[in-house]
A protein has these predicted regions:
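Structural signature of the two symmetry-related core transmembrane helices
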Residues: 43-58, 66, 137
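Short hydrophobic/small-residue motifs within alpha-helical transmembrane segments
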Residues: 19-23, 110-112
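Helix-to-loop junctions at the C-terminal end of transmembrane segments
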Residues: 28-40, 124-125
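A late C-terminal transmembrane helix in Major Facilitator Superfamily
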Residues: 95-129, 136
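Paired small-residue
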Residues: 66-74
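Multi-pass alpha-helical transporter architecture, strongest
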Residues: 137-161
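Short amphipathic helix-loop junctions that connect adjacent transmembrane helices
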Residues: 1-12
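Intracellular juxtamembrane helix-capping segments at the cytosolic ends
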Residues: 81-94
Length: 161
């Protein structure tokens, strides 16, 4: 019975981490327009990716259950504004052709949706879940670098914030 109870506890904790991520993702999306009125797109992308990155580092780098829950909640909040802002900026990157920028972001997202689960599963099977989820830290660092490149393009007048 105790083994079964332990199994239920771990499932509950995993659900709580996903629930925290989802709740704060929704909270950020619902308040995103209000936040967008006070900050530029590049500030939101930079802040969102850094908050998401911080959440992942907390969730994966600290050994306590509560830090995992906190970390994944922060990740959801940080990432909540990134995708809507990316789509907004993408629509303005190619003058008079918003469809091209939006299609690029949408296709990139589809590749991510198709590649991430099997990649994480493969890495988890061979190296452990902590190593597999660390892939997300690397990808978030790449996204953060991308926000810096985009900020430079905005300052140079090649994109609109």
């Amino acid at each position: 019975f105790e083994a079964h109870a332990g199994d239920i506890d771990w499932r509950l904790l995993a659900a709580m981490a996903y629930g925290g991520f989802s709740f704060f993702m929704a909270l950020g999306r619902f308040s995103g327009d209000r936040i967008r009125q006070r900050a530029s797109a590049t500030q939101l992308l930079n802040g969102g990716t850094l908050l998401g990155l911080s959440g992942l580092v907390i969730a994966l780098g600290l050994p306590w259950v509560w830090t995992g829950l906190l970390g994944f909640s922060l990740t959801g909040l940080g990432f909540s504004i990134v995708v809507p802002v990316l789509f907004s900026l993408a629509a303005r990157l190619v003058p008079h052709r918003p469809d091209q920028g939006i299609a690029f972001i949408a296709n990139t997202a589809v590749v991510g949706f198709l590649m991430a689960p099997p990649s994480i599963g493969f890495l988890a099977e061979h190296f452990g879940l902590d190593i597999a989820l660390s892939l997300l830290i690397g990808l978030t660092l790449i996204a953060w670098i991308g926000t810096k490149i985009l900020a430079r393009r905005v300052k140079a007048g090649r994109a609109t914030p």
